[in-house]
């Protein structure tokens, strides 16, 4: 799940979450500084003025369960780190911190699928939105032809 509707200091950076159980309506999210990554209800996503539901393209769908398993084991309950990937290796088997887009990226990177569309040191929500490995399932408040120009 992605939204374009999050801003800090005038920068529209968005927010990302990894759906860990569609049936239970559960996500794993890195919320903000000072808060460890935690499980949330998908109900909160109904309040965003924009959202994008993306999933791996058919040839990569089997990686979703592997990504969730990695996230449950390694990415839940870790500190928020706005600069994850800058001063440390971008991918770590046992990360010391993460931010929202990095959490989703790291879960899939553990399966060998690199969702970072520009390959930079920092993974952003825009990078995920523009990943060649993801299909759009549903959008609200976003042009499906131009997810995030």
Which residues does each PLM region occupy?
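Acidic, low-complexity intrinsically disordered regions
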Residues: 41-44, 76, 144
């Amino acid at each position: 799940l992605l939204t374009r509707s999050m801003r800090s200091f005038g920068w529209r950076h968005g927010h990302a979450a990894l759906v860990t159980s569609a049936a239970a309506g559960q996500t794993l999210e890195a919320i903000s500084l000072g808060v460890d990554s935690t499980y949330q209800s998908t109900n909160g996503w109904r309040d965003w003025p924009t959202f994008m539901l993306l999933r791996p393209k058919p040839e990569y769908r089997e990686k979703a369960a592997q990504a969730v398993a990695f996230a449950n084991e390694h990415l839940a309950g870790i500190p928020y780190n706005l600069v994850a990937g800058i001063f440390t290796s971008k991918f770590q088997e046992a990360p010391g911190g993460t931010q929202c887009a990095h959490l989703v990226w790291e879960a899939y990177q553990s399966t060998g699928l690199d969702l970072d569309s520009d390959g930079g040191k920092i993974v952003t929500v825009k990078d995920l939105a523009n990943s060649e490995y993801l299909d759009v399932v549903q959008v609200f408040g976003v042009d499906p032809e131009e997810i995030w120009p």
